């Protein structure tokens, strides 16, 4: 299992949100590049980077900074947030991003998703972000009418290989991921599953590993030092 430290970017700064609430953002460091270099030094497997402004606005707001992270670090980087056109997907892949995460566009634009998978295959992942069991869009601000298991099965049928799975109510809480949701997903689809949201400590990392997940994302736990990234990597 891989462990992906998270860098969420809002107005050019690394921040953490609480339950996806932009009004409850907290700056966790002064410099995005310094965060990325620190995670590289600690031998992270992968970086998970989100353009929060982009997710809200539907465009590449922090793209230049993200590209700088990709060029500066020797780690594979996955990027999400506001990627809703093939031009945006092309831009990130051409600038060295290893995996592009589609969220809103995966729900609203089947044609784009299918074309992206045809062109880039496993370099395309989908963010399964849900609240009360239903998938959310537009930076988690809007709830759809699609149940998360139905969405996951639809994504698998289209050819999606990797799902980043977040229960929004768990995000930033340090209360643990929604293991019931993750287990249900594991039982219903064969996609690679990455858990996100709520991770606090090594016990949560171990439980994700025991479930047979492909990966787990940790953000607030690392910044608030309830989880040591090196120790997490060691047990995986």
Question: Model-predicted segments: where are they?
Answer:
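Glycine-rich, proline-tolerant flexible connector loops at the mouths of alpha/beta enzymes
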Residues: 46-62, 104, 164-175
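Catalytic cores of alpha/beta
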Residues: 73, 77-96, 180-182, 186-215
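Conserved beta-strand positions in the central sheet of alpha/beta enzyme cores
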Residues: 48-51, 78, 101-102, 125, ...
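Conserved anion-binding
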Residues: 12-15, 19-23, 90, 97-171
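Conserved, mostly hydrophobic/aromatic
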Residues: 8, 39, 47, 92, ...
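Glycine/small-residue-rich loop that forms an oxyanion/phosphate-binding "nest" at active or ligand-binding sites
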Residues: 53, 61-118
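Charged helix-capping and loop-helix junction motifs
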Residues: 60-67, 141-150, 175-184
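C-terminal helical cap(s) of enzyme catalytic domains, especially alpha/beta-barrels
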Residues: 112-119, 209, 213-218, 222-236
């Amino acid at each position: 299992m891989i462990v992906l430290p998270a860098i969420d970017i809002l107005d050019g700064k690394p921040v953490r949100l609480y339950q996806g609430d932009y009004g409850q953002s907290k700056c966790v460091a002064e410099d995005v590049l310094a965060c990325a270099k620190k995670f590289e030094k600690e031998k992270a497997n992968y970086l998970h980077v989100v353009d929060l402004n982009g997710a809200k606005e539907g465009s590449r707001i922090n793209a230049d900074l993200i590209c700088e992270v990709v060029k500066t670090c020797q780690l594979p980087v996955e990027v999400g947030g506001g990627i809703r056109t093939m031009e945006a997907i092309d831009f990130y892949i051409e600038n060295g991003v290893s995996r592009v995460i589609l969220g809103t566009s995966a729900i609203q634009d089947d044609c784009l998703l299918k074309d992206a998978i045809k062109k880039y295959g496993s370099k395309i992942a989908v963010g399964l972000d849900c609240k009360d069991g239903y998938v959310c869009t537009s930076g988690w601000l809007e709830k759809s009418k699609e149940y998360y298991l139905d969405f996951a099965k639809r994504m698998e049928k289209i050819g999606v290989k990797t799902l980043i799975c977040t229960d929004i109510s768990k995000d930033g809480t340090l209360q643990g991921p929604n293991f019931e949701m993750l287990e249900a997903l594991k039982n219903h689809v064969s996609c690679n599953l990455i858990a996100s949201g709520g991770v606090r400590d090594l016990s949560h990392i171990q439980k994700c590993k025991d479930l047979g997940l492909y990966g787990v994302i940790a953000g607030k736990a690392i910044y608030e030092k309830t989880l040591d990234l090196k120790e997490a990597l060691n047990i995986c």
